Amino acid sequence: VLSPDDKKHVKAAWGKVGEHAGEYGAEALERMFLSFPTTKTYFPHFNLSHGSDQVKGHGKKVADALTLAVGHVDDMPHALSKLSDLHAHKLRVDPVNFKLLSHCLLVTLAAHLPAEFTPAVHASLDKFLASVSTVLTSKYR
């Protein structure tokens, strides 16, 4: 459960991401594909090379979903319901992949926002991404 301080940290950090959200989303995906090559199996039709339009496009989708989650942090299950359905029933993404992408997002944010990425912000973002992952996997049961 996110505390009031966690929510404050997440909103402030995501506010700093701002217009770079899509770029950071794509970078996190590239990190995931390089660090965890088995994740590529969910994107057989993508050009996964550095800077590809498909990776950039999906990175923007990831960032947009996180922006939605930040904006509805008190009601993420409702806000992310359609996305949860998509990943559980159509795409059938193994839930472990959300943890891998979350890790890569944290690394990306730490690299781009070193001054803002304090231990408290890191912990809050980690809890937030874990909450998003829980919501996205809630319909797998």
From Swiss-Prot:
The keyword Phosphoprotein applies. This is Hemoglobin subunit alpha. Involved in oxygen transport from the lung to the various peripheral tissues. PROSITE patterns: GLOBIN. InterPro entries: Globin, Globin-like_sf, Globin/Proto, Hemoglobin_a-typ, Hemoglobin_oxygen_transport, Hemoglobin_pi. Heterotetramer of two alpha chains and two beta chains. Residues 1-141 form the Globin domain. The modification N6-acetyllysine is found at K16. Belongs to the globin family. It comes from the Eukaryota. GO terms for molecular function: haptoglobin binding; heme binding; iron ion binding; organic acid binding; oxygen binding; oxygen carrier activity; peroxidase activity. Signal peptide: none annotated. CDD domains: Hb-alpha-like. GO terms for biological process: hydrogen peroxide catabolic process. Red blood cells. The modification N6-succinyllysine is found at K7, K11, K16, K40. The modification Phosphothreonine is found at T108, T134, T137. It comes from Cercocebus atys (Sooty mangabey). The modification Phosphoserine is found at S3, S35, S49, S102, S124, S131, S138. O2 binds at H58. GO terms for cellular component: blood microparticle; haptoglobin-hemoglobin complex; hemoglobin complex. Pfam families: Globin. Keywords: Acetylation, Heme, Iron, Metal-binding, Oxygen transport, Phosphoprotein, Transport. Heme b binds at H87. Gene3D superfamilies: Globins. The modification Phosphotyrosine is found at Y24.
